[in-house]
Amino acid sequence: MSLMEKILNVTRMSLIYKISLTFLFVIASNLFSINEENYRFKYKESEFKVNITNLNDKWNITYEISHPFFKLSQDTQFSYTNLIQVSEVKRKLIVMGGLRKIEESYKIDHVTKKIEYIKGQLTETLQYDGAIYDDLTAHLYLRLLNIQTDEEITLNVLERGKIRQKKFIKTISSPDTIKIKEKKEKDKFELFFKDNSKEILKVIQNVNGREFIWESH
């Protein structure tokens, strides 16, 4: 190999190294850092609690909706480095003090790209490709995502034993507030948060024609 070829080879490797570092930096900087959070929302006779906690580098989101007629809770475990990687989701609905109970869970294997879904006596295996979220981590991801507003974002979200493609859009609600809105024909989901701190301010949901306006207290 001539001296000129050696110089060109070193230059080429240096360029590849710089491009690789730039690519890694872009990935790493695409999401803001995550912090532990604790929220309590109220709407009329209902209460909505959300907690994000960390233990030994394992993250956990829990939420609980309490209503005179039902209680809905969910526990999601995930890891977070430069991306959110969900490992397990547990969801429970108790109606009329226990007259009816529904429990479901998802266990995600990121090596085989398979999800074990269990609901009562039913067990199914789902296959996925790319990033996967539940509703809680999807909303967290959208809050942390460092992108321009008014861009449509499509995420694979676990819902009712299926993997659904959900479309969201981030818009500016006020000078210091960002709104996340899910694009769908029925129902409605909107989440408002502070641009700098990422703190949730309000959540608006319309389910089966009934609107819930959850505001932080």
Write out the residue ranges for each language-model feature.
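Hydrophobic h-region of N-terminal signal peptides that target proteins for export
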Residues: 21-32
